[in-house]
């Protein structure tokens, strides 16, 4: 029997460098929510890509960040660091410039013996690729990376080059997931994340970090899926902002989320949304566990 190869590759980096966009591009479909706001990803998400005799399980993680003032931030940091355990490869994503937070992430990686690929993302924003040479020289002096790949997760340029390099590090092993499976997350999780993405995209800078979404109903029928969800905020004033004048903003969130869900599930979706206040949830460990955050 022809051997198969299977392993894990963790995607790591500071917030808002395009880790989730890269995962979606590698999988050729969207499983991880994205927005222009940092720390959009809160949970560890597995994305499974099977190509002939090779299966790579990519681990999308929350952005590692030095600021740990809030309990939710500490939870996300622990999630990101936990993803580095027992993986076969690490994909460290940066933008076309080196920041102090990148150095902080790299310090976390230096304690690990796993091979690290450095990805310089968002090169579609650079007119002359020669501008990257000083950065490549700098990062090469900081760490012995397995490979340095400038690419664009947005356009897909050079993503295949990274993928081929990751394939070479996958150990001989049976597949861990059926070839047709693309994520370990449930339909209910995907529905709640789609709602949160639409909120992140429509709201201002501060409110999204005080938001959480939980489902109170998820019922599949023959021709339709019925979903009811609660959007949790920390303050009464935030509730009004989420709902909007005459309920207009909440209606837009619902419409946008429903359309995405219908693409994901392949059938009609009936979606109901409510907004409720749960004061201090982002700093309360018990409430964080209730909302799906893990140690």
Swiss-Prot record:
Gene Ontology MF terms: GTP binding; GTPase activity; ribosomal small subunit binding; rRNA binding; small ribosomal subunit rRNA binding
Sequence segments annotated as region (G5): 151-153
GO process terms (BP): ribosomal small subunit assembly
Region named G4: 121-124
InterPro entries: G_ERA_dom (IPR030388), GTP-bd (IPR006073), GTPase_Era-like (IPR005662), KH_dom-like_a/b (IPR015946), KH_dom_type_2 (IPR004044), KH_sf_prok-type (IPR009019), P-loop_NTPase (IPR027417), Small_GTP-bd (IPR005225)
Region described as G3: spans on this chain: 60-63
The family this protein is said to belong to: Belongs to the TRAFAC class TrmE-Era-EngA-EngB-Septin-like GTPase superfamily. Era GTPase family.
Functional summary from the UniProt entry: An essential GTPase that binds both GDP and GTP, with rapid nucleotide exchange. Plays a role in 16S rRNA processing and 30S ribosomal subunit biogenesis and possibly also in cell cycle regulation and energy metabolism.
Protein name as it appears in the record: GTPase Era
Annotated organism of origin: Coxiella burnetii (strain RSA 493 / Nine Mile phase I)
